[in-house]
C-alpha cells in the first residue's frame, strides 16, 4: 500500500470518530444555550447594575462559552484557527465587517473580540438554544429597522465593537462576481464617523456552508483564517456624504466589498 492509499485509508477509518467528535461539539454548544437560559438569565435579572453592565456581563459569558467551543473543535482536530494581525481585534469600539464562509466564523470572531455586539436573524429568538444568549447579550435582530443604527451607535460610543457580515448570509462556494452587500454597515460608519475594519475570512476546505449539513465533513480539518485588513476611513467619503448620503453609503459599501473580495 503506497503513501497515498494509506492516507486515504486512514481518513476513512477516522471518519466515524470525527463524526462523533463533531456531534459532541455541537451538543456542547447547544447545552451552553440551555444553561444560559435556565441559570444565567435569572441570575442576570437578580444581579445589580445598569442594563448596560448586565449586557456586558452576558457578553463576557458568551465570549467564554464560544471560546470553549472553539477550544473543543480545535482540540478534536475538526478545525484549525489562524488569526492575522490579532492586535487589531482588541481595539475597542471597532466596526468589523467580514465575509461569511462558514457557520462558525461568527462564533470564532465573538470569542476573539473583547466585547462585541452583532446583528442576528430574528428567527433565532424563537430557538430554545439561542434565544436567552441573544436577549441577555443585547444582540440586535435583523428586523429592528432604523432603531438598529441608534442602538449600535450607542454601543460603539461605549467601546463595544460591532461584528457584521455585510452579505447578510453565508458566502457562496463559487463566486464569479461581487456578492450583493447590504449598506447598513456603511450607513452606521458614516453616521458614527468611525472607520470600518474589513476582516477577510478564508476557509479551506469549506465546511458548514449555506444549506450544508454539519455531518458532511471535509476530508481534512477546515482551516479558518481571520485577517484584519487596513481600516477604511470614512473621511474619504465625506465630500460625497455632504452631497448624497445614499451615494456615500454605496461607495463605502463597494470599498468594503473590494477589500473582502479583491479577486472579483
Task: Please identify what each model-predicted range represents.
Residues 2-94:
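Membrane-anchoring hydrophobic helices of lipid-metabolizing enzymes
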Residues 2-5, 9-12, 149-264:
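Non-catalytic C-terminal accessory region of glycerolipid acyltransferases
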Residues 41-67, 76, 90-145:
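Catalytic core of membrane glycerolipid acyltransferases/transacylases, capturing the structured
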Residues 73-74, 134, 155, 189:
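A generic structural signal for well-ordered alpha-helical segments
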Residues 75-83, 142-146, 208-211:
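Short gly/ser/thr-rich secondary-structure transition/capping motifs
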Residues 80, 115-116, 140, 159, ...:
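Secondary-structure boundary/capping positions in well-ordered alpha/beta enzyme cores
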Residues 81-99, 129, 151-156, 196:
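Alpha-helical membrane-embedding segments
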Residues 84, 120-121, 166:
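Thr-Gly-centered strand-to-loop micro-motif
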Amino acid at each position: 500500500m503506497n503513501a497515498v492509499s494509506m492516507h486515504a485509508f486512514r481518513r476513512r477509518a477516522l471518519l466515524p470518530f470525527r463524526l462523533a467528535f463533531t456531534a459532541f461539539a455541537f451538543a456542547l454548544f447547544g447545552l451552553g444555550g440551555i444553561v444560559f437560559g435556565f441559570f444565567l438569565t435569572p441570575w442576570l435579572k437578580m444581579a445589580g447594575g445598569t442594563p448596560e453592565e448586565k449586557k456586558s456581563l452576558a457578553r463576557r459569558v458568551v465570549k467564554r462559552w464560544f471560546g470553549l467551543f472553539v477550544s473543543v473543535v480545535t482540540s478534536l482536530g475538526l478545525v484549525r484557527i489562524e488569526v492575522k494581525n490579532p492586535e487589531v481585534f482588541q481595539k475597542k469600539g471597532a466596526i468589523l465587517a467580514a465575509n461569511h464562509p462558514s457557520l462558525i466564523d461568527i462564533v470564532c470572531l465573538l470569542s476573539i473580540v473583547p466585547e462585541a455586539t452583532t446583528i442576528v436573524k430574528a428567527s433565532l429568538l424563537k430557538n430554545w438554544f439561542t434565544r436567552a444568549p441573544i436577549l441577555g447579550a443585547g444582540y440586535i435582530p435583523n428586523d429592528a429597522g432604523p432603531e438598529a443604527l441608534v442602538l449600535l451607535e450607542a454601543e460603539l460610543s461605549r467601546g463595544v465593537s460591532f461584528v457584521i457580515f455585510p452579505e447578510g448570509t453565508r458566502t457562496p462556494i463559487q463566486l464569479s462576481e461581487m456578492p450583493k452587500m447590504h449598506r447598513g454597515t456603511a450607513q452606521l460608519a458614516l453616521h458614527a464617523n468611525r472607520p470600518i475594519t474589513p476582516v477577510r475570512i478564508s476557509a479551506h476546505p469549506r465546511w458548514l456552508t449555506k444549506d450544508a449539513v454539519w455531518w458532511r465533513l471535509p476530508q481534512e480539518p477546515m482551516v479558518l483564517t481571520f485577517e484584519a485588513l487596513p481600516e477604511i476611513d470614512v473621511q474619504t467619503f465625506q465630500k460625497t456624504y455632504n452631497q448624497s448620503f445614499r451615494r456615500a453609503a454605496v461607495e463605502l459599501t463597494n470599498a468594503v466589498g473590494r477589500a473582502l473580495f479583491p479577486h472579483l
